[in-house]
């Protein structure tokens, strides 16, 4: 992305100039009138650029209710993949994150032989005539012909910037100063590809991003591998991505500004790293502090201890709840590791908040139980389990979560069957509908995935 528009407050109002060239209906591709995405009112047939160094008179090549595609005069007019793909990506985005203004369309602009890279604009910005825009270019005069690889990666990336800059009807991206340009997009794009059923693109993207290394907030950071993918894969996937923006919209400070046409809410400032971890923990429904420490270390880019910021964020935003109560309880298991609870793979490792240790027991017993007993009652609304570092057939497969206040009468709170873990040391979140307080919680494991042994790296209980 070449330019960011999230922080711009235009001092002038610009409108597209009158067009001297008319396009006949036969020159514009439109959706089938019987399609649910068909429209009766067309967007402008031409659009004069008036932003940054852009000065092209754009030609409308396709439109429906989801997308309006514009080419400059140097783009091959036979290219059609944006018509379907961008409409699908935009529809999926709106279905996931909500609407973006009153116009249902994404306005997609393509350049060939100029303006390498891309930028977004949102419906808040007069700079691009109050439209949700992605504007992409290439130095290659024959660009955009494949509709694969970088063609969809770059355009999807720019849509992701609209999400972070205009979700929930609020302008700006409070997290941009933390994840910079592209870290959020890496997980957004992965989710879009999966959501559209483009599994080969999702796999391609995953393989591209897993080895990616960044120098912020510290050198050697793997944003996708160690943060976004574990959060996504272990804690609710698409719903968690959306919930992050929902929580921002509910609780993060904002004020009202105007663009000269209408007034709208805008986030007041950027979040600090502790707030970032706090809001993502709220979105995940689990305490992500340890995951963040493993991924980023304890210092933000300026050298500040973000764990102090996190403690303050919990005070500043108390409505965001994800209290991990595991450490308040006493663990017991019905069969212990041969070396004892304190052994390298003893039961103490099950609740040590270290996702790289594990509990192992040889000779998996039928009806194995692990229990947490608390001095007072709590409402556990969710829990996590983390797979071991090897041999997936040792993972739990069928289990129940139960609660009790006396240790004799137990109530079933959650039942899971046929469960598998996609990767080693994968953390998965399981939500319950429990609203009752219990002083004892246990997981009863009736089957693993086939091994004579059993292992689990971590079990955490989350109070709502």
Give residue ranges: language-model regions.
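Bacterial Sec-dependent N-terminal signal peptides
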Residues: 2-50
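Low-complexity, Pro/Thr/Ser/Gly/Ala-rich linker/spacer regions in secreted
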Residues: 27-44, 311-334, 462-464
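Zinc-dependent metallopeptidase catalytic helix centered on the HExxH motif
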Residues: 128-211
């Amino acid at each position: 992305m070449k330019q960011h528009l999230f922080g711009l407050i235009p001092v002038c109002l610009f409108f597209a100039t009158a067009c001297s060239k008319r396009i006949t209906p036969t020159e514009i591709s439109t959706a089938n009138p019987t399609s649910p995405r068909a429209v009766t009112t067309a967007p402008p047939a031409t659009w004069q650029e008036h932003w940054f160094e852009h000065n092209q008179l754009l030609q409308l090549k396709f439109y429906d209710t989801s997308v309006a595609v514009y080419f400059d005069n140097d783009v091959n007019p036979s290219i059609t993949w944006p018509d379907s793909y961008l409409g699908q990506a935009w529809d999926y985005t709106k279905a996931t994150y909500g609407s973006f203004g009153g116009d249902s369309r994404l306005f997609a602009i393509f350049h060939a032989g100029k303006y390498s890279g891309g930028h977004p604009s949102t419906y808040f910005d007069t700079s691009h005539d109050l439209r949700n825009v992605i504007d992409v270019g290439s130095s290659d005069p024959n660009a955009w012909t494949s509709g694969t690889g970088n063609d969809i990666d770059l355009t999807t990336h720019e849509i992701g910037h609209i999400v972070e800059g205009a979700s929930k009807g609020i302008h700006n991206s409070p997290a941009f100063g933390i994840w910079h340009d592209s870290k959020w997009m890496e997980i957004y794009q992965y989710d879009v590809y999966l959501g559209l059923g483009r599994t080969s693109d999702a796999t391609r993207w995953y393989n591209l991003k897993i080895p990616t290394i960044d120098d912020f907030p510290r050198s050697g950071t793997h944003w996708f591998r160690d943060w976004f993918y574990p959060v996504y894969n272990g804690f609710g996937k698409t719903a968690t991505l959306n919930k992050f923006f929902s929580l921002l919209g509910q609780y993060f400070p904002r004020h009202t500004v105007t663009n000269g046409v209408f007034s709208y809410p805008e986030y007041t400032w950027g979040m600090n790293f502790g707030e970032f971890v706090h809001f993502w923990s709220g979105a995940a429904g689990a305490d992500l502090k340890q995951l963040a420490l493993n991924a980023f270390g304890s210092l933000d880019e300026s050298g500040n201890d973000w764990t102090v910021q996190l403690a303050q964020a919990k005070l500043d935003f108390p409505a965001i709840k994800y209290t991990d109560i595991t450490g308040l309880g006493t663990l017991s298991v019905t069969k212990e590791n041969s070396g004892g609870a304190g052994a390298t793979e003893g039961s103490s490792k099950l609740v040590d908040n270290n996702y790289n240790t594990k509990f192992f027991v040889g000779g998996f017993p039928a009806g194995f139980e692990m229990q947490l007993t608390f001095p007072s009652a709590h409402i556990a609304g969710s829990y996590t389990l983390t797979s071991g570092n090897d041999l997936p057939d040792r993972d739990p497969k069928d289990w129940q979560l139960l609660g009790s206040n006396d240790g004799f009468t137990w109530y079933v709170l959650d039942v899971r069957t046929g469960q598998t873990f996609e990767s080693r040391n994968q953390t998965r979140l399981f939500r319950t509908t429990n609203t009752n307080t219990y002083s004892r919680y246990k997981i009863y494991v009736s089957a693993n995935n086939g091994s004579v042994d059993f292992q689990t790296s971590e079990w955490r209980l989350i109070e709502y």
